[in-house]
């Protein structure tokens, strides 16, 4: 089993091997700890495995079952292969290295009431009533001109922005993973979440291209959303806005 280390100074591309754990069965997606270092089990195989011939072996303890879903792990591997990049570059798009703080914030979540009723009534487009919907905007200007403040602040909606604090982002990660939020609205940089069960993706104005200085990986948003549609068996809808 290959592991990904959240320690910023760990080894080649922060990848290592899982040592003997006795009778404890470790599965891909599990979170483990060794000393003060956290590791994510990412699977029995790696993309570009020839680059990982001499890896360190560690024997960590299990700390969180199913910390990441299979669909998210599959997206990790696909992005590494498709964009010829590293696991380090891909994983950081999804999750912070401050795992202890992330785990602490899970226990502070507040239970939500009815998630969808008010949201569906206030939104003109078709949402997934039973599962999660991701709505992706090219920029905040388009988002704010296409949605009302009441909608963005609805109980069942997670509004994600690159301007939010790390604490806010961590809380949203848990809310999305645990299905406390049914509708996720965001710009391109925030699409990388560990969804509970994503069944609808709405891609708004895809003709607006995304650029980022020194961006790695240099992913194409449309390609990533299409792969997410495939992995989650979700519907992908493209919306064109005319002002």
Question: Across the structure, where does each feature detected by a protein language model lie?
Answer:
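Accessory, non-ATPase domains that flank or precede helicase/AAA+ motor cores in DNA-metabolism machines
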Residues: 1-242
């Amino acid at each position: 089993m290959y592991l990904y280390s959240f320690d910023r100074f760990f080894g080649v591309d922060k990848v290592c091997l899982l040592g003997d754990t006795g009778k404890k069965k470790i599965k891909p997606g599990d979170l483990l700890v060794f000393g003060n270092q956290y590791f994510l089990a990412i699977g029995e195989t790696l993309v570009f495995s020839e680059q990982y011939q001499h890896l360190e072996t560690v024997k960590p303890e299990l700390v969180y079952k199913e910390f990441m879903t299979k669909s998210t792990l599959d997206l990790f591997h696909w992005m590494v292969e498709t964009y010829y990049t590293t696991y380090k570059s891909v994983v950081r798009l999804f999750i912070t290295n401050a795992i202890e703080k992330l785990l602490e914030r899970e226990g502070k979540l507040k239970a939500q009431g009815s998630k969808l009723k008010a949201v569906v009534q206030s939104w003109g487009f078709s949402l997934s009533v039973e599962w999660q919907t991701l709505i992706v905007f090219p920029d905040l200007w388009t988002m704010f001109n296409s949605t009302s403040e009441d909608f963005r602040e609805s109980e069942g909606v997670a509004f994600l922005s690159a301007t939010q604090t790390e604490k806010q982002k961590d809380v949203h990660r848990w809310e999305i993973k645990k299905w406390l939020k049914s509708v996720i609205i965001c710009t391109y940089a925030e699409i990388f979440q560990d969804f509970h069960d994503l069944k609808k993706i709405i891609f708004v104005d895809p003709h607006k291209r995304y650029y980022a200085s020194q961006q790695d990986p240099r992913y194409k948003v449309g390609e990533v959303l299409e792969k997410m549609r495939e992995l989650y068996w979700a519907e992908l809808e493209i919306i064109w806005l005319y002002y």
